[in-house]
Amino acid sequence: MTNDIHLAFAHPVERAAASSDLPYDRISLRDYTVEVEIGAFQQERGTLQRVRFNVVVEVLPLTGPIDDDVDRILSYDRVTEAIGVELQAERINLLETLAARVAERILLEPQAERVFVRIEKLDRGPFSLGVEIVRARDGQTPAAQEHVEVPHPRVVYLSNAAVS
């Protein structure tokens, strides 16, 4: 159990190394920080905040020689481009949405088999807040939860004069 807890909060590279029996190679992007307007709360609207990305992409090993040819591998710039494209597409409220979209875009790359995406907000307090997801090419997510419709209440403020 202690090892499970350690891995749950370990860096994605360490977790990826311990979580698969398949002979994957891993490409990692660590501590990629950008400023972006993101957040569901009113105080986050119109304000840039720093967001840090850590991404690990598992790829099947090449069957032939690499020949020092960038076109034979999944290049790091494809990972940063996936992040950039999703950040520029539209304003997003939730880190969960952004992480899922980045993962989906990375999995469009033919070499990518599985991707770990961790995103953290760095400016919401003296700590970091974040989300971490795992997605695989086959569409399977570990312990995927089935979609449950949840209520979305609307809150309306009415002054005393309005209700009298």
Predicted stretch roles:
Residues 1-164:
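N-terminal, polar/charged subdomain of small-to-medium soluble alpha/beta proteins
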